[in-house]
């Protein structure tokens, strides 16, 4: 009887171990720059097994899932990650770049990135530069440089800031943010030329500039937005009245808190960008001054709650 029980237990242990062994054999765990480069070039799921210093490229037509595994990937002389294909980032850990004029992630034209985990950091340029399509649902972005935005979605208008990539006719860069923590920068999120921005959730904070600066088409339906500098507004909207810079901002929800315990301005505009544009507000909670002095237009407000009821014209 004891022998039968022993055999049964042994078989049970084998059955339990098989999935674990299969997972271990199938997982591509990399711990060196060369191994990481080879793995992302091939495609599939790749897991960091150590901190790695390397600049990698996801080739066009290649699908890569990068599990940071609690480790840090630091760039080495170029963008830390250049995505030309399809990239999904999961797990805890960091993607960092400290090189001048380089991003932690550069997502180029027609590339797709799904950022579901990890923290992206930079301190000399944009942390994320997007010319393709990015969806963020769980990743965080920290910008330590007040001279650059944390995220730039779209074209700036010069080769250096656009990674020498010209704008294809009829093309839009799209950034969708559903969740995550975003902080710092000249602007935390800048929706640039030909950019389409959709924010439905997340926490956005800045001690230097606006949490969001929109130049083209942006919609905010949720999230928390807060600034601490009395010299800046929570949200800024600019327009040059062109196809690239329409300056169309729509807010249907979210919580917006200005500086100085809610005594600062909620709305501002991009420098030089006062040629047309529109701000439409139908929902959200706004704590701060709704004065739009200097704006080229009056915000259209049909809903929402405001601490400054006097200036929130409905």
Regions found by a protein language model. Name each.
Residues 57-65, 82-96, 105-122, 129-146, ...:
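Surface-exposed loop/turn motifs in large extracellular/passenger domains
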Residues 27-36, 310:
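Disulfide-bonded cysteine-rich modules in secreted/extracellular proteins
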Residues 17-28:
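Sec-dependent signal peptide cleavage junction
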Residues 39-53, 64-69:
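Glycine-rich repeat segments that build the extracellular carbohydrate-interaction surface of secreted
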Residues 1-9:
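Positively charged n-region of N-terminal signal peptides that target proteins for export
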Residues 9, 13-17:
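Hydrophobic core
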């Amino acid at each position: 009887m004891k022998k039968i029980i022993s055999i049964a237990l042994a078989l049970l242990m084998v059955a339990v171990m098989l999935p674990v062994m299969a997972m271990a054999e199938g997982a591509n765990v990399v711990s060196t720059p060369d191994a990481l480069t080879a793995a992302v070039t091939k495609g599939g799921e790749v897991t960091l097994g150590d901190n790695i210093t390397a600049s990698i490229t996801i080739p066009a037509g290649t699908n890569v899932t990068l599990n940071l595994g609690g480790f840090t990937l630091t760039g080495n002389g170029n963008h830390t990650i250049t995505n030309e294909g399809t990239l999904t980032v999961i797990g805890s850990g960091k993607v960092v770049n400290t090189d001048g004029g380089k991003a932690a992630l550069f997502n180029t034209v027609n590339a797709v990135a799904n950022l579901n985990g990890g923290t992206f950091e930079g301190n000399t340029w944009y942390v994320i530069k997007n010319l393709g399509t990015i969806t963020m649902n769980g990743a965080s972005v920290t910008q330590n440089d007040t001279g650059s935005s944390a995220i730039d979605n779209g074209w700036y208008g010069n080769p250096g800031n656009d990674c020498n990539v010209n704008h294809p006719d009829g093309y839009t860069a799209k950034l969708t943010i559903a969740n995550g923590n975003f902080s710092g920068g000249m602007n935390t999120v800048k929706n640039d030329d030909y950019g389409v921005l959709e924010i439905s959730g997340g926490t956005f904070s800045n001690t230097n500039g606006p949490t969001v600066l929109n130049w083209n088409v942006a919609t905010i339906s949720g999230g928390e937005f807060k600034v601490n500098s009395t010299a800046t507004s929570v949200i800024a909207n600019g327009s040059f009245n062109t196809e690239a810079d329409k300056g169309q901002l729509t807010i249907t929800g979210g919580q917006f808190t200005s500086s100085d315990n809610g005594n600062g301005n909620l709305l501002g505009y991009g420098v030089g960008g006062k040629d047309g544009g529109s701000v439409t507000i139908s929902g959200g909670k706004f704590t701060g001054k709704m004065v739009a002095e200097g704006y080229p237009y009056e915000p259209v407000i049909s809903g929402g709650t405001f601490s400054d009821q006097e200036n929130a014209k409905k």
